[in-house]
């Protein structure tokens, strides 16, 4: 996936959490998150049942994260930077969103990722369908 940031294109290899169980787990217990690795919660909420404000926490998450909240038009609504490991304090999107990306804490600032930047990705099902139709 790519974020068109002010500092240039930022590329991430992100897993996809698209079920309720996967989204509840998130990056809990992960200690080895690489610089350009992340987890995309898409659709958010699972099943795509309408937009809603997102609220995350860092329970059981030993690594600081940047949590990027993404609008339906794929622009960034908010970047919650350097979240506190293990915190149970809610981290809110501030507005309804359709996807959320978690990356290693501090990366958004390093790469110049900010509100309004455009996020682009191919949903796994769409990539598979395109390969089947094209092949």
Segments predicted by a language model, with ranges:
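Compact, glycine-rich, soluble single-domain proteins
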Residues: 1-135
């Amino acid at each position: 996936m790519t974020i068109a940031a002010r500092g240039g294109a930022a590329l991430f290899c992100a897993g996809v959490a698209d079920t309720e169980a996967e989204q509840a787990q998130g990056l809990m217990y992960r200690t080895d998150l690489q610089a350009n690795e992340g987890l995309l919660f898409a659709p958010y909420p699972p099943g795509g049942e309408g937009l809603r404000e997102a609220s995350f926490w860092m329970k059981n998450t030993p690594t600081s994260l940047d949590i990027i909240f993404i609008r339906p038009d794929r622009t960034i609504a908010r970047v919650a930077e350097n979240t506190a490991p293990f915190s149970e304090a809610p981290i809110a999107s501030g507005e309804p969103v359709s996807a959320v990306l978690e990356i290693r804490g501090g990366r958004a600032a390093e790469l110049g990722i900010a509100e309004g930047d455009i996020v682009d990705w191919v949903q796994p099902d769409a990539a598979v369908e395109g390969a089947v139709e094209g092949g």
